[in-house]
Amino acid sequence: MDIKKSIEHFMYELRLNQNQLAIKAGMDISTLSLIRNQLRSPSLATLNKLATACEVKVSEFIA
Protein backbone atom coordinates (compact mmCIF):
# COMPACT_ATOMS: atom_id res chain seq x y z
CA MET A 1 0.00 0.00 0.00
CA ASP A 2 1.38 3.42 -0.84
CA ILE A 3 1.46 6.31 1.60
CA LYS A 4 -1.56 8.05 0.07
CA LYS A 5 -3.68 4.90 0.29
CA SER A 6 -2.50 4.26 3.86
CA ILE A 7 -3.42 7.76 4.96
CA GLU A 8 -6.84 7.52 3.35
CA HIS A 9 -7.42 4.01 4.73
CA PHE A 10 -6.62 5.00 8.31
CA MET A 11 -8.54 8.28 8.02
CA TYR A 12 -11.57 6.21 6.99
CA GLU A 13 -11.04 3.60 9.71
CA LEU A 14 -10.63 6.24 12.43
CA ARG A 15 -13.32 8.49 10.96
CA LEU A 16 -10.95 11.46 10.77
CA ASN A 17 -10.84 14.20 8.21
CA GLN A 18 -7.56 15.63 6.98
CA ASN A 19 -7.58 18.49 9.48
CA GLN A 20 -8.27 16.16 12.41
CA LEU A 21 -5.47 13.80 11.39
CA ALA A 22 -3.02 16.68 10.98
CA ILE A 23 -3.86 17.96 14.47
CA LYS A 24 -3.63 14.48 15.99
CA ALA A 25 -0.26 13.94 14.29
CA GLY A 26 1.01 17.38 15.34
CA MET A 27 1.68 18.59 11.82
CA ASP A 28 0.48 21.34 9.49
CA ILE A 29 -2.53 20.51 7.37
CA SER A 30 -0.64 21.84 4.34
CA THR A 31 2.13 19.28 4.91
CA LEU A 32 -0.38 16.46 5.15
CA SER A 33 -2.13 17.72 2.02
CA LEU A 34 1.14 17.73 0.08
CA ILE A 35 1.88 14.17 1.20
CA ARG A 36 -1.64 12.97 0.33
CA ASN A 37 -1.38 14.56 -3.10
CA GLN A 38 2.04 12.94 -3.57
CA LEU A 39 3.75 16.29 -4.02
CA ARG A 40 6.01 15.70 -1.03
CA SER A 41 7.65 12.59 0.36
CA PRO A 42 7.31 12.24 4.12
CA SER A 43 10.41 11.99 6.28
CA LEU A 44 10.77 9.07 8.66
CA ALA A 45 9.85 11.41 11.53
CA THR A 46 6.67 12.45 9.71
CA LEU A 47 5.79 8.82 8.98
CA ASN A 48 6.25 8.09 12.67
CA LYS A 49 3.91 10.95 13.62
CA LEU A 50 1.27 9.74 11.18
CA ALA A 51 1.56 6.12 12.28
CA THR A 52 1.35 7.12 15.94
CA ALA A 53 -1.71 9.27 15.24
CA CYS A 54 -3.31 6.31 13.45
CA GLU A 55 -2.35 4.00 16.32
CA VAL A 56 -0.29 1.65 14.13
CA LYS A 57 3.38 0.83 13.65
CA VAL A 58 5.28 2.57 10.87
CA SER A 59 5.74 -0.84 9.22
CA GLU A 60 1.95 -1.27 9.05
CA PHE A 61 1.58 2.23 7.70
CA ILE A 62 3.94 1.70 4.77
CA ALA A 63 3.18 -1.98 4.06
Which functions belong to the PLM regions below?
Residues 1-17:
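A short, Lys/Arg-rich alpha-helix, primarily the initiator
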Residues 10, 44-45:
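Short, Lys/Arg-enriched C-terminal cap helix and immediately downstream tail that follows
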Residues 11, 22, 51:
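The alpha-helix within a helix-turn-helix
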Residues 16-34:
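Short alpha-helical DNA-recognition segment
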